[in-house]
């Protein structure tokens, strides 16, 4: 039979390493941070931002955070940034949220933690080439107990919240 290598604690296998990585974007962003749009409204799904919500603010922050949300309940964020990947390989992403959240990298959905729910953690993995990749995170808070954490790990990177130094502002179109 075929042998399979399993790398602890990343849970990445030799089969995962055979996945063709998404190519890096040919961009050179200069400024670090995350761009956001902030919405208020009654949401049960991230698709409801445009239909049930009102855009109240936009700006930039150092990392993905909901701590400065003006409302306690019934709000949402749409975050966009470039993620600087230090080495080609398979990366695990972990999204812990209350309520719903979705994570896309280079337009590909990596984690679906959507819907109105108490704090829940979901993960996904994706192979990425060294360089910059578009990261798009959608989050909403329905009511009671808002939480949002996005973590990353790989064979050579312990699980951690994505460091500020890996995040760059999207380029103006």
PLM feature spans:
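Gly/His-enriched, cation/cofactor- and phosphate-binding structural elements
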Residues: 1
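Extracellular/secretory pathway-exposed regions associated with glycan biology
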Residues: 4-92, 96-173
């Amino acid at each position: 039979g075929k042998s399979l290598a399993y790398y602890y604690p990343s849970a990445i296998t030799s089969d995962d390493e055979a996945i063709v990585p998404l190519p890096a974007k040919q961009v050179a962003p200069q400024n670090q941070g995350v761009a956001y749009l902030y919405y208020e409204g009654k949401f049960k799904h991230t698709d409801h931002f445009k239909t049930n919500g009102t855009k109240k603010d936009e700006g930039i922050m150092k990392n993905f955070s909901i701590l400065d949300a003006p409302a306690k309940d019934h709000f949402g964020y749409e975050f966009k940034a470039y993620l600087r990947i230090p080495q080609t390989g398979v990366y695990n992403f972990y999204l812990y949220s209350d309520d719903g959240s979705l994570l896309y990298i280079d337009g590909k959905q990596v984690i679906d933690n959507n819907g109105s729910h108490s704090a829940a953690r979901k993960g996904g993995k994706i192979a990425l080439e060294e360089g910059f990749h578009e990261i798009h995170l959608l989050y909403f808070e329905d009511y009671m107990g808002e939480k949002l954490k996005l973590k990353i790990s790989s064979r050579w990177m312990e699980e951690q919240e994505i460091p500020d130094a890996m995040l760059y502002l999207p380029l103006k179109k």
